[in-house]
């Protein structure tokens, strides 16, 4: 059963065609990934599907009465409420039912009308079916999985960092448990263990979802079908990401072969026409000219652009390029309790890892001289 049908979708951005006459469907059992190079229109497609922008041409049709949940990482958060209170808003309709239930009991206490108890019983059954009394357990599961519980449930949402804020919005969306999840880069700001948890969660998700992610390892773990955007077309592949990429490469090789064969045929036909247009075979030449005019010419294949980055290298006689001594970093207060004492030698390649908010960027800014150390010092080789 198709939850979403996209027909003849066309979209341009300034003078660039993102897609032209694209077609695909999202079925009930689909865990769909969206792939393609930067700038091909993945996020634009998500905005079209969620109604944030209107497509130039074509039809985007969702099944009626479908709850589609979209990850809006820039949603506004109201100051003055804690993390848990915010997450409870995912169940606002159930809390409203609980209020109706309590009001019925109050009225029954006032007039003893048995019909009120009957209404209350129906609401009670509804709440139990919706697992209302397990809400705290559900919140704990998601908040712990995404690393929000460690921040403290009473933490004011207005005081969260950008990454923590994105986690909170994602957590609420998951708790709402929509029929379809639409996620654009959900792993942004997530640490490795949180990505692992999210992958497990999505694999167990009973609904359908569409996910855009630059993390192909994550995408490969959660998807059972792929739509790939490439040079104005949207192609759907069944199976996981590895299968889709293999099939895409096979399709590309077939296209290159077909294009080369057609070009050879065109050149051969054009040569025949030039040679025989004015001679005894002019009738045959004109016939081939008409055939050539009616030919469906294949679009020239385009090569994917590859980045070429050059980091200027300055040779140095020193074996020690960086030395820190009891270096403490932070803004108003230290981000890391222990002082840094480390060195970087000539030729070493160093990775800086750690949880979000632990101080990785702050360390780099300090070493670049953009922030002053709270304590200690460091020395760079001249």
What are these regions (language model features)?
Residues 158, 276-277:
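Conserved short loop/turn motifs at secondary-structure junctions
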Residues 1-255, 305, 311-382:
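ABC ATP-binding cassette signature C-motif
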Residues 247-272, 276, 285-301:
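Intracellular alpha-helical coupling/juxtamembrane segments of multi-pass membrane proteins
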């Amino acid at each position: 059963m198709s939850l979403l049908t996209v027909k003849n979708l066309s979209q341009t951005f300034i003078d660039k065609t993102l897609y032209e006459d694209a077609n695909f469907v999202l079925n009930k059992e689909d865990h769909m990934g969206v792939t393609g190079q930067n700038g091909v229109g993945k996020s634009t497609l998500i905005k079209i599907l969620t109604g944030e922008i209107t497509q130039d041409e074509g039809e985007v049709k969702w099944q009626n009465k479908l709850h589609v949940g979209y990850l809006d990482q820039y949603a506004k958060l109201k100051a003055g409420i804690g993390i848990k209170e915010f997450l409870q808003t995912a169940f606002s309709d159930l809390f409203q039912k609980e209020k109706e239930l309590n009001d019925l009991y109050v009225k029954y206490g006032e007039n003893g009308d048995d019909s009120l108890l009957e209404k209350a019983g129906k609401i009670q059954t509804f709440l139990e079916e919706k697992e209302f009394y397990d809400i705290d357990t559900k919140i704990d599961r998601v908040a712990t999985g995404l690393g929000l519980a460690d921040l403290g449930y009473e933490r004011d949402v207005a005081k969260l960092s950008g990454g923590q804020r994105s986690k909170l919005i994602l957590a609420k969306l998951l708790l709402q448990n929509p029929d379809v999840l639409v996620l654009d880069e959900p792993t942004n700001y997530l640490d490795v263990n949180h990505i692992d948890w999210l992958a497990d969660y999505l694999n167990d998700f009973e609904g359908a979802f569409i996910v855009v992610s630059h993390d192909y390892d994550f995408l490969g773990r959660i998807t059972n079908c792929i739509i790939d955007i490439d040079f104005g077309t949207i192609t759907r592949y069944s199976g996981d990401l590895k299968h889709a990429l293999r099939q895409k490469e096979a399709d590309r090789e077939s296209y290159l072969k077909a294009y080369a064969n057609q070009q050879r045929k065109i050149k051969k036909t054009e040569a025949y026409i030039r040679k025989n247009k004015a001679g005894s075979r002019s009738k045959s030449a004109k016939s081939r000219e008409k055939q050539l005019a009616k030919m469906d010419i294949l679009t020239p294949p385009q090569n994917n652009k590859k980045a070429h980055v050059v980091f200027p290298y300055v040779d140095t006689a020193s074996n020690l390029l960086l030395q820190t001594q009891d270096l403490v970093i932070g803004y108003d207060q230290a981000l890391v309790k222990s002082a840094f004492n480390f060195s970087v030698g000539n030729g070493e390649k160093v990775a800086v890892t750690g949880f979000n908010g632990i101080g990785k960027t702050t360390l780099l800014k300090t070493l670049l001289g953009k922030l002053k150390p709270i304590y200690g010092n460091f020395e760079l080789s001249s």
